[in-house]
């Protein structure tokens, strides 16, 4: 009996008795040569018909031919990434550098949290703000780590600089000084992110460019705008009683980061 499957390839289901001849198979018959014994003496096998027509003209994609390209070969060495594709070495390095940037900024914010949480400073709103800011930057670093692994890169954690522990400023006061420092850090982080984006574009890596754009760049300019407003407000209230009111606003504001 005959089994027709398409105009490109045709197959028939032939009974095989004992060791009879089996029709000639296609070159990728290893994917199609299925057999099942029945009663131990008679079986059925899917085979290519010897009169199968030639492939249709105009075929634009032949996967098994395409897979012969060397750069699509799956690595055998156990220490080589299997997922890596179109991921340049300098893109990998730029992501590792950005991980370090995020951890460093997180560390500075954590130092600010510790400072404002002191018993003789006791600006709980600022302590809360910088603690949450530190956690956010650390989450960014972890997000970059996950992306590095997705692309088949290797995470390299660089040393983190120790931040200062004192943030008193005789002219500006500690609150304004700390918030201006935070604004500068956010602008610096944005500059570093733009560098990572430019590296991705230079290497024709739209996936990395899209990752930086969609996950970081817009949120970064929002953070810059928010902290710039805080700097402006602290400049208005001065170093006295107004700082306490500003701090209370931060303490009870659930959407300040």
Swiss-Prot record:
UniProt region (Extension peptide (EP)), positions on chain: 52-84
GO biological process: intracellular iron ion homeostasis; iron ion transport
Keyword annotations: Chloroplast, Iron, Iron storage, Metal-binding, Oxidoreductase, Plastid, Transit peptide
GO MF entries: ferric iron binding; ferrous iron binding; ferroxidase activity
Entries under SUPFAM superfamilies matching the protein: Ferritin-like
Oligomer status and interactors: Oligomer of 24 subunits. There are two types of subunits: L (light) chain and H (heavy) chain. The major chain can be light or heavy, depending on the species and tissue type. The functional molecule forms a roughly spherical shell with a diameter of 12 nm and contains a central cavity into which the insoluble mineral iron core is deposited.
Name of the protein in its database record: Ferritin-2, chloroplastic
Organism annotation: Glycine max (Soybean)
Biological classification of the source: Eukaryota, Viridiplantae, Streptophyta, Embryophyta, Tracheophyta
């Amino acid at each position: 009996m005959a089994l027709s499957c398409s105009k490109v390839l045709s197959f028939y289901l032939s009974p095989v008795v004992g060791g009879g001849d089996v029709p000639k198979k296609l070159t990728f018959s290893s994917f199609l040569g299925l057999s099942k014994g029945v009663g131990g003496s008679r079986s059925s096998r899917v085979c290519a018909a010897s009169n199968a027509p030639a492939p249709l003209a105009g075929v634009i994609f032949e996967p098994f031919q395409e897979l012969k390209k060397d750069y699509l070969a799956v690595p055998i060495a156990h220490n080589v990434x299997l997922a890596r594709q179109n991921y340049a070495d300098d893109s990998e390095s730029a992501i590792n550098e950005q991980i370090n940037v995020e951890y460093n900024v997180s560390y500075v914010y954590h130092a600010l949290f510790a400072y404002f949480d002191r018993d003789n400073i006791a600006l709980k709103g600022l302590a809360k703000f910088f603690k949450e800011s530190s956690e956010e930057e650390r989450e960014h670093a972890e997000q970059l780590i996950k992306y590095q692994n997705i692309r088949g890169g290797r995470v390299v954690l660089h040393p983190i600089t120790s931040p200062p522990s004192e943030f008193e400023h005789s002219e500006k006061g500690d609150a304004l000084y700390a918030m201006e420092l935070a604004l500068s850090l956010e602008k610096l982080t944005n500059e570093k992110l733009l560098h990572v984006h430019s590296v991705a574009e230079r290497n024709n890596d739209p996936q990395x460019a899209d990752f930086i754009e969609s996950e970081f760049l817009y949120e970064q300019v929002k953070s810059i705008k928010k902290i710039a407003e805080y700097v402006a407000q602290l400049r208005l209230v001065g170093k006295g009683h107004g700082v306490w009111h500003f701090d209370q606003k931060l303490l009870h504001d659930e959407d300040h980061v």
